[in-house]
């Protein structure tokens, strides 16, 4: 809508849309974006568009910029305008920090740029979001499996207790409670994954949310309450961090004015399973792009990972 409006405006007044860049919420988190909105208690927006609107007449530029803000408002968005040189520089600074997306993987990522027709862009971002939801749920199921393996090993690490109680007495049925909890949560998450096509709107809007903190960590702290069980809880957190480190996800930033989308997958180069999962995601991304009448050769052309497609 912005692009169409600006194309007409260029013919009418000569005001140009010189650039239009996009960052999704994963990129916003990576670059440390400080939201300008007063809504949502400071939460990050789902995406940010940064545009350069230029012209010879300052009043015309201001009028057209206000129209772009109005378009954003009609789509539950907000618009913020930088007029001075210093303010404009700050607006564009976040876009320049996009390499931060792979800082947790020592700057290693699979970068697949594709070009999508602008009228199909929303379908592409939805498709990527579905891939991300599936990857997240698969990682959550792997976490459950790792936790069940930990509880099945027998002896759990225990701290000192002021009372002279044996480890067996301390644990009593706590392990069984923990196992039942994990199995119950795992069954729910597995059902969501199996029915992701139907449940996608609820999962995308976080009306359904697979949460380690609320569904597993908090109940575990209740089951294993007391000083003697601190080592158990510490080990559960270690397991979570280890499994989370291998989670694959897809982040998007794009030259939104022409449909060139950088589809980036940060990976640990020494994690074979993670690399395999990432390449499976690439295959789905290529199919998705072409199904929307897009092309898989963006501004960076064809590289090793695209060769087979």
Where are these regions (language model features)?
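Noncatalytic alpha-helical scaffold of FAD-dependent oxidoreductases
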Residues: 1-298, 302-309
């Amino acid at each position: 809508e912005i692009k169409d409006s600006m194309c007409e405006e260029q013919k009418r007044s000569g005001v140009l849309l010189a650039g239009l860049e996009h960052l999704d919420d994963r990129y916003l988190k990576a670059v440390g974006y400080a939201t300008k909105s007063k809504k949502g208690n400071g939460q990050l927006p789902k995406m940010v568009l940064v545009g350069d609107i230029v012209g010879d007449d300052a009043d015309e530029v201001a009028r057209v910029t206000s129209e772009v803000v109005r378009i954003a408002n009609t789509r539950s968005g907000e618009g913020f305008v930088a007029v001075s040189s210093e303010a404009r520089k700050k607006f564009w600074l976040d876009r320049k920090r996009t390499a931060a997306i792979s800082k947790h993987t020592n700057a290693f990522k699979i970068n697949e740029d594709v070009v999508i027709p602008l009228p199909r862009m929303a379908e592409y971002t939805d498709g990527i979001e579905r891939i991300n939801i599936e990857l997240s749920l698969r990682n959550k199921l792997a976490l459950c499996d790792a936790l069940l393996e930990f509880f099945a090993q027998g002896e759990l690490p225990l701290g000192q207790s002021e009372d002279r109680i044996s480890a067996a007495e301390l644990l009593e049925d706590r392990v069984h409670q923990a196992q039942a909890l994990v199995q119950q949560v795992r069954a729910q998450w597995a059902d969501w994954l199996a029915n992701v096509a139907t449940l996608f709107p609820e999962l995308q809007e976080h009306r359904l949310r697979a949460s380690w903190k609320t569904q597993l960590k908090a109940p575990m702290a209740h089951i294993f309450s007391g000083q003697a069980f601190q080592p158990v809880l510490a080990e559960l957190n270690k397991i979570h961090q280890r499994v989370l480190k291998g989670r694959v996800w897809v982040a998007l930033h794009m030259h939104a004015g022409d449909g060139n989308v950088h589809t980036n997958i940060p990976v640990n180069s020494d994690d074979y399973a993670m690399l395999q999962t990432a390449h499976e995601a690439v295959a789905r991304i290529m199919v998705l792009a072409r199904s929307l009448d897009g092309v898989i050769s963006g501004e960076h052309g064809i590289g090793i990972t695209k060769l087979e497609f």
